[in-house]
């Protein structure tokens, strides 16, 4: 049986070495006598699909990317020169699109995040003291189609006004006849005379002020009788805060007799629950 015959390439390099070398030389010369892919830019892009290499004298065109617009008279094309390099070009012709100018709101400020109105940037809004912001505190310059637009309407600064503060049982506050209070307006509470032998104590902050759009700086105080029991300490004595009756915030100090030491605090205060805080100490050997 005869061995199978081998098929040979009709144009092997061994039979036609001259033809093979000529083709290789033509291929190499076509690539060496050319430019590589054209440069890329942040703001521009080619108007046609890039090729691996370009002939000398071949020209490519650029157009501005989305979000950029052309700024004449700069060139937006380049040419493969005889040195097999692209003629210098930059993307300076294409500049970022910008959002329209927004002025400071009345009684406030509009602050650019990085000093320009170009797309991708932010505009921050703040209000002066005595005013609060209604609307979004930050707007973004965004692309909508081919235009640069703000992400919303600019906010406004509204004057801070407070409703009258709460009334309290067994007490009153100043300016009770006023219907509307402005920023930092303050009222002071006081207690009425008590009907019994012990007076009302004002528990809490006596003065609150109109703070912001949420209202007053704190809760109103209470007017109530606060009276702690007479403090008794065995094997010791009072050194300060003497009295017969002990009302809200009354303070008493103690010391132990010789040979005893104190357990607890040497100073106690009558708190709003009519108890001593901390508890009355003890004197032990």
Swiss-Prot record:
GO process terms (BP): complement activation, classical pathway; innate immune response; single fertilization
InterPro entries the UniProt entry points to: CD46, Compl-Cell_Adhes-Reg, Sushi/SCR/CCP_sf, Sushi_SCR_CCP_dom
Matches recorded under CDD domains: CCP (cd00033)
Positions annotated as glycosylated: 114, 167, 207
Keywords annotated in UniProt: Complement pathway, Cytoplasmic vesicle, Disulfide bond, Fertilization, Glycoprotein, Immunity, Innate immunity, Membrane, Repeat, Signal, Sushi
Domain remark from Swiss-Prot or TrEMBL: Sushi domains 3 and 4 are the most important for interaction with C3b and C4b.
Family matches, as Gene3D superfamilies: Complement Module, domain 1
Top-level taxon: Eukaryota
Keyword presence, Methyltransferase: no
Tissue: Present in blood and sperm. Isoform 2, but not isoform 1, is present at the erythrocyte membrane (at protein level).
Family matches, as SMART domains: CCP
Cellular localization per UniProt: Cytoplasmic vesicle, Secretory vesicle, Acrosome inner membrane
Name of this chain's protein: Membrane cofactor protein
Complex and partners: Interacts with C3b. Interacts with C4b. Interacts with moesin/MSN.
Main location: membrane
PTM (free text): N-glycosylated. Probably less N-glycosylated in testis.
Function: Acts as a cofactor for complement factor I, a serine protease which protects autologous cells against complement-mediated injury by cleaving C3b and C4b deposited on host tissue. May be involved in the fusion of the spermatozoa with the oocyte during fertilization. Also acts as a costimulatory factor for T-cells which induces the differentiation of CD4+ into T-regulatory 1 cells. T-regulatory 1 cells suppress immune responses by secreting interleukin-10, and therefore are thought to prevent autoimmunity.
Mode of membrane association: Single-pass type I membrane protein
SUPFAM superfamilies: Complement control module/SCR domain (SSF57535)
Domain Sushi: 35-96, 97-159, 160-225, 226-285
Signal sequence, start to end: 1-34
Intrachain S-S bonds: 99-141, 127-157, 162-210, 191-223, 228-270, 256-283
GO cellular component: cell surface; inner acrosomal membrane
């Amino acid at each position: 049986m005869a061995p199978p015959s081998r098929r040979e390439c009709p144009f092997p390099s061994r039979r036609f070495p001259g033809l093979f070398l000529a083709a290789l030389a033509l291929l190499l010369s076509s690539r060496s006598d050319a430019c590589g892919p054209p440069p890329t830019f942040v703001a521009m892009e080619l108007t046609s699909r890039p090729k691996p290499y370009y002939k000398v004298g071949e020209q490519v065109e650029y157009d501005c990317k989305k979000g950029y617009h052309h700024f004449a008279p700069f060139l937006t094309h380049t040419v493969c020169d005889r040195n097999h390099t692209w003629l210098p070009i930059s993307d300076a012709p294409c500049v970022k699109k910008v959002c329209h100018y927004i002025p400071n709101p009345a009684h406030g400020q509009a602050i650019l995040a990085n000093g320009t109105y170009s797309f991708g940037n932010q505009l921050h809004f703040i209000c002066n003291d005595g005013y609060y912001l209604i609307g979004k505190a930050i707007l973004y310059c965004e692309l909508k189609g081919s235009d640069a637009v703000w992400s919303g309407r600019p906010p406004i600064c509204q004057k801070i006004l407070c409703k009258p503060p709460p009334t309290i049982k067994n007490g009153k506050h100043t300016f009770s006849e006023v219907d509307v209070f402005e920023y930092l307006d303050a009222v002071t509470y006081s207690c009425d005379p008590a009907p019994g032998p012990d007076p009302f104590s004002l528990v809490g902050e006596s003065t609150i002020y109109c703070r912001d759009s949420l209202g007053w700086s704190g809760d109103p105080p209470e007017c109530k009788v606060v009276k702690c029991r007479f403090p008794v300490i065995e094997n010791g004595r009072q050194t300060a805060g003497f009295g017969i009756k002990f009302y809200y915030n009354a303070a008493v100090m103690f010391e132990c007799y010789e040979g005893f030491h104190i357990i607890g605090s040497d100073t106690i205060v009558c708190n709003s629950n009519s108890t001593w805080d901390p508890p009355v100490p003890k004197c032990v050997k």
